[in-house]
Amino acid sequence: MEEFQGYLELDKSRQHDFLYPLIFQEYIYALAHDHGLNRSILLENVGYDNKSSSLIVKRLITRMYQQNHLIISVNDSNQNPFLGHNKNLYSQMISEGFAVIVEIPFSLRSVSSLEGKEIVQSHNLRSIHSIFPFLEDKFLHLNYVSDILIPHPIHLEILVQTLRYWVKDASSLHLLRFFFYEYYNWNSLITPKKSISIFSKRNQRLFLFLYNSHVCEYESIFLFFRNQSSYLRSTSSGALLERIYFYGKIKHLVEVFVNDFQAILWLFKDPFMHYVRYQGKSILASKGTPLLMNKWKYYLVNFWQCHFYVWSQPGRIYINQLSNHSFDFLGYLSSVGLNPSVVRSQMLENSFIIDNAIKKFDIIVPIIPLIGSLAKAKFCNVLGHPISKPARADSSDSDIIDRFVRICRNLSHYHSGSSKKKSLYRIKYILRLSCARTLARKHKSTVRAFLKRLGSGLLEEFLTEEEQVLSLIFPKASSTSRRLYRGRIWYFDIISINDLANYE
């Protein structure tokens, strides 16, 4: 935030919400590509930083000054005089700068709203792994869970209308429409499935901003019981996920509820309702009855459609009983099961056998989807049999091993919280043998002969750092070592889902 305040005349911007002139300032583009704004962890530039320079930025600004309007036809975009020969580069640079500009009002409001409030500031709570200790603590006492697929707007103009509440500069909103129509397949912008449009791939920062502003709109309904929620929020998509920014919207929602929904306000008084979200999926769990969960389901659908104009269907919300259902979230399969235990109690001459069943939150790695992800990445076939990677056969041996080891360690690091490690051992086996097949193919040898020549060195490379430390401290055969290998570990440095663990 200090970087923004150092460069911008914030008092003027705050009074008039007039942001459009900032698009002509060179330092905006410097901020857009500055890796010191705590953004480098979340977003990586998409390969044009080597082409961007102060000279290109100045040339771009000169062209914008000379052009009287920003009108573009999708059919005639290749000959647009505003963009010229460097259409893709210039358009991408403008969109990156524009993303910085429209974030300013939200950043200012976040700073002012956080002042004087006691909110957990630990960076550890940014980790998406912090969600699982929260689930372990809360879900053992709940009965039902709803898997919610996030609804999408009927038309992208709704995204522009959403921003009008915060950005009151008409020129900036027109520029946003310009970017929507600049790219083909723009209707797939919000689609979280396989092929996100060219727009979202080449304009990641702007895409995440729009997506989160859209999600926070309909998510603001849950602010009514935010006092019962945990501060373990995922901030992997940026600071916009902090719902504290939307106090203005709450005021409006209170009026709506009081006037139109007085009869159903009791729904919000459930102290055992908990909500978590990541990307396009959210989980809503409660200790209530099936009737209460179904009322929530149809109420949310109608509320989103009538007041936020987002298309949703009851079929996108799945209600299940926690005791006999496993829900897929963040690459893990989670469930609440009963762990039976038998206790023998003896009092004088009489003895009793007491059966106890303790609830246990079980988290495992779904092996079939993970093998499917590895098969898509050409590490194995659909049955899980390792295959070689011919695309990497031209690299050096050390480079090939490093790449496989990095993938293996990242997966082990991400899935370290699994209750059962057998799935991880199988994944390690697939990656290790795929690496050996790739190297053997490169050297025109058999896998057996290559592994015999390489010895145990390849196996040691695939050990994670924590396994290497434990192997030095404890003997492999000791019970302490085995318990630590099997133990569940959550790492608070993970702020985004692993690509191979993202099965959507």
From Swiss-Prot:
Usually encoded in the trnK tRNA gene intron. Probably assists in splicing its own and other chloroplast group II introns. It is found in: Plastid, Chloroplast. It comes from the Eukaryota. This is Maturase K. GO terms for cellular component: chloroplast. It holds the Pfam family MatK_N. Belongs to the intron maturase 2 family. MatK subfamily. Disulfide bonds: none annotated. One of its GO terms (molecular function) is RNA binding.
